[in-house]
């Protein structure tokens, strides 16, 4: 077969395809990919209120500890360890992802913790908070709070958004309020020859070693402490198919 004869079937097929396209109606013609118009969102809203309470820890021993925990872990880890009275603990995460099918993508974590008009009495109380050999060799976002005592507030927040869209936002808002609380810390000598004093011990030992990513660790002993670990990440393109884009992170 001559080369000219071998090309004839291909030429005929291309000509036929072009003829069909020429006869197609307006609705059947090729159209560009439409710009993203939707919205993808992940939101966490959380409220914790401790109000008008009375806590009496007389000669009480409060021990809060994390020993050999959260090591060799990956991803998002939130741990709260508390011992005592009137403590508030919370972990919140808002994660969203979109592959170019939305114009606006955002993740929001909005947290409110309130401790108000409470009465805390510590007489001869011992509070020990210890983080020992924990969160080692971990990667990702790790938030650890350890508290011993009364009226402590603990919080771990995470807001992450990844998208191909033109508008990307990640926001995390944490509000911790301690208002009009009464704390009484004094030695206790009742039924004892020697007074027993209030003791607060907070320790961090051999923890968070060889870890990568965002690591937040809080250790507190006593009364009325407020602890928070927050991470916000926003990742998107600056020039997308939908037009000029933007990245926002709060």
From Swiss-Prot:
Ranges for region Linker 2: 161-199
One GO term of the biological process aspect: cell adhesion
GO cellular component: extracellular region; pilus
Subcellular location: Fimbrium; Secreted
Keyword entries, A-Z: Amyloid, Cell adhesion, Fimbrium, Repeat, Secreted, Signal
Domain of life: Bacteria
Motif Cys-X-X-Cys per UniProt: ranges: 237-240
Keyword field contains RNA-binding: no
FapC_R repeats mapped onto the chain: 62-95, 127-160, 200-233
Cystine crosslinks: none
Main location: other
Signal peptide region: 1-24
Region (Linker 1): 96-126
Traits of the deletion mutant: Deletion of just fapC in an overexpressing strain yields cells without amyloid fibrils. Deletion of the entire fapA-fapF six-gene locus shows no visible growth phenotype.
Subunit: The major component of purified amyloid fibrils. Forms fibrils in vitro; in the presence of FapA the fibrils are about 50% wider. Interacts with FapA. Fibrillates in vitro; this is inhibited by FapA. Fibrils are resistant to boiling in 2% (weight/vol) SDS and require >90% (vol/vol) formic acid to dissolve.
Domain remark in the UniProt entry: Each of the three repeats is modeled as a beta-hairpin; the repeats and inserts are modeled to stack on top of each other, overall forming a beta-helix. Soluble monomeric FapC is predominantly disordered.
Family recorded in the similarity comment: Belongs to the FapB/FapC family.
Function in brief: The major functional amyloid subunit in this bacterium. Intrinsically disordered in its monomeric state. Upon overexpression of the endogenous six-gene locus (fapA-fapF) in situ, cells form large clumps during liquid growth, make large amounts of biofilm and produce amyloid fibrils. Expression of the 6 gene operon in E.coli strain BL21(DE3) induces flocculation and biofilm formation with copious extracellular fibrils.
Protein name as annotated: Functional amyloid subunit FapC
